């Protein structure tokens, strides 16, 4: 998969893929908002419609992940280092929650 990801980002260029990432993050946010609105207003037309909203969220998450993986591979970043930093940030946020912080 790494070779394919590098081929894509080298073809379109880093700047283009950065803009694409921004677009895909926006689409993910929009998909989540639509899901929440439908759930809160019960305007989904039934449970099967909620499943469609969830599937759309999954698709948008995949789009964002693909672009993040392209950028990670482009810069030859160490994935275990990213995982370690993510774990530290998660732990820090859990501490904030324990301390009653809301940010």
Give residue ranges: language-model regions.
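Flexible "arm" and connector segments at domain edges
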Residues: 1-103
